[in-house]
């Protein structure tokens, strides 16, 4: 089996999934209040890659509401955590996104 080298540019989310770079707590927007319990696991991140969108019953794609570069607030235990080098990412379904920030 050949070794696969993962980087942000090689990760292509499928369907309605969104690949998000997790923001360090000190980079969080100051205008948002996060209770102490939310500081355990970051819930804010920047979109770095998108899937093509959810497939509808008729075969067409439903466009995602977010775009690369958007800052998001997402569910605390949502998605799959991915570490590439020293950076942390999370692969989310669009339904796990709570809000766009900024």
Swiss-Prot record:
Task: Please give one Pfam family short name.
Answer: Cpn10
**Disulfide bridge positions per record:** none
Q: Which InterPro entries does the record cross-reference, listed alphabetically?
A: Chaperonin_GroES, Chaperonin_GroES_sf, GroES-like_sf
UniProt key word Chaperone:
yes
Instruction: Please name the GO terms of the biological process aspect recorded for this protein, alphabetically.
Output: chaperone cofactor-dependent protein refolding
MF terms in GO? ATP binding; metal ion binding; protein folding chaperone; protein-folding chaperone binding; unfolded protein binding
Q: Does the keyword Chaperone apply?
A: yes
CDD domains noted in UniProt: cpn10
GO cellular component assignments: cytoplasm
Print the keywords alphabetically. Chaperone, Cytoplasm
Give its localization.
Answer: Cytoplasm
What family is it from? Belongs to the GroES chaperonin family.
Q: Partners and quaternary state?
A: Heptamer of 7 subunits arranged in a ring. Interacts with the chaperonin GroEL.
Report the PANTHER family cross-referenced here.
Answer: 10 KDA HEAT SHOCK PROTEIN, CO-CHAPERONIN GROES
> What is the documented function of this protein?
Together with the chaperonin GroEL, plays an essential role in assisting protein folding. The GroEL-GroES system forms a nano-cage that allows encapsulation of the non-native substrate proteins and provides a physical environment optimized to promote and accelerate protein folding. GroES binds to the apical surface of the GroEL ring, thereby capping the opening of the GroEL channel.
Q: What is the protein name given in its UniProt record?
A: Co-chaperonin GroES
Q: Which organism is it from?
A: Anabaena sp. (strain L31)
Q: What is the gene called?
A: groES
């Amino acid at each position: 089996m050949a070794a696969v080298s993962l980087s942000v540019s090689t990760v292509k989310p499928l369907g309605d999934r969104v690949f998000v770079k997790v923001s360090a707590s000190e980079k969080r927007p100051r205008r948002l209040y996060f209770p102490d319990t939310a500081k355990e696991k970051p819930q804010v991140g920047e979109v770095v890659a998108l899937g093509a969108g959810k497939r509808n019953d008729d075969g067409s794609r439903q466009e995602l509401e977010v775009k690369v570069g958007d800052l998001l607030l997402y569910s605390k235990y949502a998605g799959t955590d991915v570490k590439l080098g020293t950076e942390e990412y999370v692969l989310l379904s669009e339904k796990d996104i709570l809000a766009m920030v900024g």
